[in-house]
């Protein structure tokens, strides 16, 4: 399992530990990932994704999984998240055509 957020694409970054004597040694900054069960309002399903804690706060701020996925770029999303996004788009399109008819 990769250390990458399934919604934002945030992965490990590289930097330095800097000692008091200013000696730099390489280190990795790993994202704070946690498994989360996210509810889709339009689909009525729960999805288990491994996302960063920052992504979880962003989901709450934007108003839920569906809104976040519809506004996210496809390059950032994992293949699982892309499938969920396609399902949400199809459901929204079906609802729009039902209202128009």
Curated annotation (Swiss-Prot):
It comes from the Bacteria. Pfam families: Ribosomal_L28 (PF00830). One of its GO terms (biological process) is translation. The keyword Ribosomal protein applies. GO terms for molecular function: structural constituent of ribosome. One of its GO terms (cellular component) is cytosolic large ribosomal subunit. Keywords: Ribonucleoprotein, Ribosomal protein. Belongs to the bacterial ribosomal protein bL28 family. This is Large ribosomal subunit protein bL28.
């Amino acid at each position: 399992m990769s250390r990458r957020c399934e919604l934002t694409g945030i992965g490990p970054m590289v930097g330095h530990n800097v000692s008091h004597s200013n000696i730099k040694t390489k280190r990795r900054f790993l994202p704070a990932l946690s498994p989360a069960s996210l509810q889709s309002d339009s689909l009525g399903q729960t999805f288990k994704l491994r996302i960063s804690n920052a992504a979880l706060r962003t989901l709450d701020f934007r108003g839920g999984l569906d809104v976040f996925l519809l506004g996210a770029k496809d390059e950032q999303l994992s293949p699982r998240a892309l499938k969920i996004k396609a399902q949400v788009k199809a459901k929204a399109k079906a609802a729009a055509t039902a209202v128009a008819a």
